[in-house]
């Protein structure tokens, strides 16, 4: 499969497997974010029958938050994760095969069939900064405060018109006079989508996983 118009973010809620790409393989498991740049030919090989993914598409690249990076693109010390937490593909031997290889390509919101005469993973090496990667949510080190902090403090990724936040287990609002959770309010600047993958959320009650 190749998405020729959008970058993709896959969050693994259930299941394990391997993300196979023309630049190498990434093993994934529960809690992994998979970032797949547009134009990447890939295949998901699943190891289990029960697999649940949260799937997002972006017409702009998906980055780490700008405020966590210096002018050279390096993650700063106050970032909730660092470069060592990001895993890149493991190189595999090229598939020197000929035949009819069907590639599903998404373009202009349609799926097109392309037949390759050689295996799309017939690659002997790659160079540059264009590759898929993974980051596990359990490596996200939350930033906490004695009083309530706004949701952007949990930001993990950003694109042109949306952000992705990771609300993980943490101490929160531990000042003796702090309001323990935000009171009823209206967010007129942003639409919010919450995906429950584990545990309970501080400001919502009686919600089950994947609600």
Locations of regions flagged by a protein language model:
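Jelly-roll (double-stranded beta-helix
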Residues: 1-211
